[in-house]
Amino acid sequence: MVYKLVLLFCIASLGYSVEYKNTICPHRQDYRYWYFVAELTIGVNYDINSTIIGECHMSESYIDRNANIVLTGYGLKVNMTIMDTDQRFVAAAEGVGKDNKLSVLLFTTQRLDKVHHNISVTITCMEMNCGTTKYNSDLPESIHKSSSCDITINGSCVTCVNLETDPTKINPHYLHPKNKYLYHNSEYSMRGSYGVTFIDELNQCLLDIKELSYDICYRE
């Protein structure tokens, strides 16, 4: 009888010990597995003609369950935060497309879909047409997605912004480091798209990432 009571106690203790708890990925400088979480396209009203090696710099942090990345390059500062999340940013790359469009590839430790997230993006003009806040509102979504996104644009250099989350395509010519492994969403219905434009139709802000060359943003 005593043996049975001890066994029941052990089973109950084991069941209690595996109760779900929130955890996060430990901080590393050399994550090997990159998930392609978002592609951000930004149009500007000054000339950017080609991808420049070493132009983009990045810093990332994870504080109070908020994942943040800050990118600088091509006259812009891009600050993105994913709120209340277990994931963190691991890398980014930037490339220049036609008609003065900048494409930003963002990589994290896991995907966005099936979990509601609040995403905040701030884009600041650093060199040309700097000035007061031009736009501060929710970023309209053109494809239904569970995440919500707000954007702030400081300065008048930005002509359009398009954000695609959990993209289903990744540039096959993107030259990522050989010791990294890239993953991306394969379910078309789970991707999201948000955009705003100031001078052109929004579809003019879309780029075929297969036509671009990218350079990885250097960590600061």
Curated annotation (Swiss-Prot):
Pfam families referenced in this protein's UniProt entry, alphabetically: Pox_M2 (PF04887)
Primary location: host cell
Function summary: Plays a role in immune evasion. When secreted, inhibits T-cell activation by preventing the binding of host CD80 and CD86 to soluble CTLA4 and CD28. In the infected cell, may inhibits host NF kappa B activation.
InterPro entries on file: Poxvirus_M2
UniProt name for this protein: Early protein OPG038
Source species, domain of life: Viruses
Oligomer and partners: Homooligomer. Interacts with host CD80 and CD86 when secreted.
Transmembrane segments: none
Subcellular location: Host endoplasmic reticulum; Secreted
Homology family: Belongs to the orthopoxvirus OPG038 family.
Induction: Expressed in the early phase of the viral replicative cycle.
Glycosylation positions in this chain: 49, 79, 118, 154
GO BP of this protein: symbiont-mediated suppression of host NF-kappaB cascade
Gene Ontology CC terms, in alphabetical order: extracellular region; host cell endoplasmic reticulum
Signal peptide as annotated in the record: 1-17
Organism of this sequence: Monkeypox virus
